[in-house]
């Protein structure tokens, strides 16, 4: 019943400011302005660290960030999902183009820092849209999904899958629903 760092899905937008500084975080309400965030009390700690590490790697791989106003650039968003019970970690790199220069070296570099990542997926979103994920994706490392266990059931989680972001409280809520349903076994 942890009130902190419970979000097992974390996403960040990327932007390069006028001074050339790469920022990762969330959009300011009603704008394309990215507010920089390195960590958040509700987000998974490892997910936050992965996002910061990717941001720091971008210049060495000459990767540009996507500009919402011009529709140009490479990296749009990052999505990190972690299985609460399994500790499996998925890194999704949302790009504006399918071409991913130095992808193998980039994958090696991020895995060197975070060997606990079990899969890395490139999701391609070339459209000028507010939707984070595009229709197409490529598995760069691992199986392209993670698994987690919730209420004794195993779930396979893909980049586009909906999955409860707070599994501990979800199990409490589902348990209460079952209790209040007062099931007898012959329904």
Protein language model regions, located:
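Accessory RNA-recognition modules of RNA-modification enzymes
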Residues: 1-187
